[in-house]
Amino acid sequence: LGDSYLSGPQQLFKRFTFLLSEAGAAREQAKKESLLRGAVRELEKLRTLVRRGSAYLTERLEAKAGEPDANPLYDALGGVRKKEELEALGLTLAETALLQLAFEVRYDEAKREFLDLGHWISLSDGTLYREMNFRPLSAKNYIAEKDSSDRRLRAERFPYYPAFPGEAARIRLEDATAEQPEAADFARIIGFAAPIAQAVKQAAKALQSVLAEDKAPALLQLSDVAVKEDAVYLRDAAGSLL
């Protein structure tokens, strides 16, 4: 169909059918139930996106609006934004520096795609952002793999993408200058860390949005970390446990 379909709903449907297929082949009951819960979650996302996306597109058509707006539904439906479009919408982070807190590589079997995911923090206000580099298997020889970074990044403007309430926005870092971080930067980051109760409250708010990312990053203020068998236990100064 070329450009005559919306890639966002298609990807959700692919993941839904993939999880159903995996659940049917699973022998362990616990794994089967986990896969089925995941399939239901994808179906819930698909239903929500169809309902909200249809209303959004109808409104845009009636208004004869052809240019992308700052609604994250545009991205969820599969819209692709250029850096210049983000800047034109005023979606830029200015006069700040960023440091990476964590880095991971995920693989989505349903999409047959790797995701290099960097979690960054603004040294100005402690806001968390995500750098996302998508690498489909079909284009693995043409898209460079990202790596972790221990440098402070600075730019005149960092463009970022619209996000659902409470969700860490995706940010673009290609025009940034890398610098050696200072001790004061790490002290500032520690000052932004939240106690467990506050972080859980913020994460719960982010996860209320069906179309938002399933995982909510948080910078925790901890006093103890313990590992027992396959579980990690966290405690903060107030005695809260996670």
Predicted feature descriptions by range:
Residues 1-242:
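Helix-loop junction hotspots and adjacent acidic micro-motifs that serve as functional foci
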